[in-house]
Curated annotation (Swiss-Prot):
Listed name of the protein: Acetyl-coenzyme A carboxylase carboxyl transferase subunit beta
GO biological process, one term: fatty acid biosynthetic process
Organism, as annotated: Rhizobium leguminosarum bv. trifolii (strain WSM1325)
Subunit structure of this chain's protein: Acetyl-CoA carboxylase is a heterohexamer composed of biotin carboxyl carrier protein (AccB), biotin carboxylase (AccC) and two subunits each of ACCase subunit alpha (AccA) and ACCase subunit beta (AccD).
Record's keyword terms, sorted: ATP-binding, Cytoplasm, Fatty acid biosynthesis, Fatty acid metabolism, Lipid biosynthesis, Lipid metabolism, Nucleotide-binding, Transferase
EC nos: 2.1.3.15
Residue ranges of domain CoA carboxyltransferase N-terminal in the record: 25-294
HAMAP family, sorted: AcetylCoA_CT_beta
InterPro entries linked to this entry: AcCoA_carboxyl_beta, Acetyl_CoA_COase_Trfase_b_su, ClpP/crotonase-like_dom_sf, COA_CT_N
UniProt similarity note: Belongs to the AccD/PCCB family.
Pathway: Lipid metabolism; malonyl-CoA biosynthesis; malonyl-CoA from acetyl-CoA: step 1/1
Keyword Hydrolase appears in the UniProt entry: no
Length: 301
């Protein structure tokens, strides 16, 4: 009896017992409720296959997808003071930084790299939204400035992929200082004659929208991205009136002249390459003639 109780029963229980399933094994589409296996979602560039809804894409995956063969040089993360204000709300800021670093395996919200897109050298800067909402703090601001300096020094274009809730409140005025700093960095690149293209992703809001995210020579946007300064609910409460359907979406901003093109994620590398070749006066291939007219129009606008 002891043999059955002590050996056989535990073995059966272990075989039939419930196994732990990772929380992110299946991803639910916010738009349609469709459940997608996470590997299928990653393989489709974080776009829901049936609905075409663009999920937030990790910064590392974004850079690997953008550059030819996924090859690029990562720019080093600048060292800045950690938690200079000793800020605490419901949680210590230092603890938030630690947790975000464990979650994303990044030092801060910005990842930057140098590589080639269809043979054209450029610097790309990407926000990681899962790092404290992609917020702009001292480390992020310094990383952005360094990326612009690198692009200026190497005389190559810079492409920005913002995804942010705005300035990082835990750093107070030190965070707000990054708005003029990054704006000056944009001007520095433009004075050197190099193109600056912004690909607006979901969401792009707050102080990021009020600075470098809306200073590009050309603005692309992913479908359905929320783009604005204050949130829709805040504006409605302030104005005490209902805002139009689709307000602050990529498509709404395209209709009202705030962005130049809405581009699906799968088409972004090709579109960027063609735009940059036009802007830098390099030969453009005859392929994809259907898109060339729209791209040339955007470049001349």
């Amino acid at each position: 009896m002891n043999w059955i109780t002590n050996y056989v029963r535990p073995r059966i229980n272990s075989m039939l017992g419930r196994r732990e399933v990772p929380e992110n094994l299946w991803i639910k589409c916010p738009e349609t409720g469709e459940m997608v296996f996470h590997k299928d979602l990653e393989g489709n560039k974080w776009v829901i296959p049936a609905s075409g809804y663009h999920m937030k894409m990790p910064a590392k995956a974004r850079l690997a997808d953008l550059f030819d063969n996924g090859e690029f040089e990562s720019l080093p993360q600048p060292k800045v003071a950690q938690d200079p204000l000793k800020f605490r709300d419901s949680k210590k800021y230092s603890d938030r930084l630690r947790d975000s670093r464990l979650k994303t395996e990044q030092e801060d919200t910005i990842l930057a790299g140098v590589g080639k897109v269809q043979g054209l050298k450029l610097v790309a800067v990407v926000h990681e939204f899962n790092f404290i909402g992609g917020s702009l703090g001292m480390a992020a601001g310094e990383a952005i400035v360094k990326a612009f300096e690198r692009a200026t020094a190497e005389k190559c274009p810079l492409v920005m992929f913002p995804a942010s809730g705005g300035a990082r409140m835990q750093e107070g005025i030190l965070s707000l200082m990054q708005l003029p700093r990054t704006t000056v960095a944009v001007d520095m690149l433009k004075e050197s004659g190099q193109p600056y293209i912004v690909v607006l992703t979901n969401p792009t809001t707050g102080g990021v929208t009020a600075s470098y995210a809306m200073l590009g020579d050309i603005h692309l946007a992913e479908p359905g991205a929320e783009i604005g300064f204050a949130g829709k609910r805040v504006i409605e409460q302030t104005l005490r009136e209902k805002l139009p359907e689709g307000f602050q979406t990529s498509e709404y901003l395209l209709e009202h002249g705030m962005v130049d093109m809405v581009v699906k994620r799968h088409d972004i590398p090709e579109t960027l390459a063609r735009l940059l070749k036009i802007l830098t006066k390099k030969p453009v291939s005859a392929a994809n003639d259907m898109n060339s007219g729209a791209i040339a129009l955007a470049a001349s606008a």
